[in-house]
Amino acid sequence: AVNGAQNLTITGNLDLNGAITEVADFSVSGTTDLGANVTTTGTQTYSGAVTLSGAERTLQGSTITTQATLTGGSQNLIITGNAVFGNGTGDTVTGVGTLNITGNTTIHTNTITTSGTQIYGNATSDTIVIGTATTLTTTNSQITFTGLVDSESGQTNNLTLAVGNSEVEFDAAVGATTPLGAIVITGALDLDAIIQKTSGSAAGATSLTVSTTSNLGANVNTSGIQTYTGAVTLSGANRTLK
C-alpha cells in the first residue's frame, strides 16, 4: 500500500497491486493496470490506457480523469467524485460491469459500454457534459442521469443510448444550458425533467427518438422531430411537446 499527504507522479507505466490511500494529487503518464483501489484528496490523472483487474474498483478523489481508453474485465467501477472520460473521439470505455459516478461527469469518449447499469451523478445539481458525439450502451440495464445533461459549450453533440429492454431515466433538465444534438434511445424513456433550454425557453435538443415506451413526466422542446415508437404515458401535470 502507498499512503501519504504528498503528490505522487509516476512517469511511465503502472501495475498497481496494492491500494493507494490519502495521497494528494496522483498522476500516471503511461498505461495503468488498476489491480487495487485509489483514494486521493486531490485529482487523479491517467494519461495512458487504463485496465481494471481483480475485483470491483473504486477511485475516490476530487476529479478522476482518464485521457485514453479504459478497459475492464467485467468489474464494477465506482468513481466517488467528479469524472472526465477520454480526450479524443477514438477513446472508449468497455468491459465494465456497472458504472457509478457520484459527482459531475464530462464524456469525451466515442462509447461507454457496460453489462450493468450506468449512473451519472448523485444529485440533480450535478452536471453531465456530452463533450463529443457519444454512445452509451448497457446489456438490458438502466442508464440514469441524476444530474443536468448538457452538450459541451458551443457544441451540439449527439447522444445515443442503447439499453435493450431497460430504460433511460432523466432526473434533471436536459439541454438547459447548452442544447444537445440528436438524442436517440434504443429502449424505453422515463423523463422526469424538461428537455428545454432555460434561457428563452429554446429547444433542449435537435431531435428525440425513442424505440419503445415513453413516460413523459416533463415537457419536451426540440428544434426538429420527435419520434415515439412505443406507447406514451403522460404523468404529472399537463404536457407540452414542441
Regions found by a protein language model. Give the residues of each.
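Extracellular lectin-like interaction modules
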Residues: 1-242
